[in-house]
Amino acid sequence: GPDSSFLRL
């Protein structure tokens, strides 16, 4: 979802 890039932090 759109949060995927955030979770990669």
UniProtKB/Swiss-Prot annotation:
One of its GO terms (cellular component) is extracellular region. It is found in: Secreted. Coiled coil: none annotated. Keywords: Amidation, Neuropeptide, Secreted. The modification Leucine amide is found at L9. Its main location: secreted. GO terms for biological process: neuropeptide signaling pathway. The keyword rRNA-binding does not apply. It comes from the Eukaryota. FMRFamides and FMRFamide-like peptides are neuropeptides. Belongs to the FARP (FMRF amide related peptide) family. This is Extended FMRFamide-3.
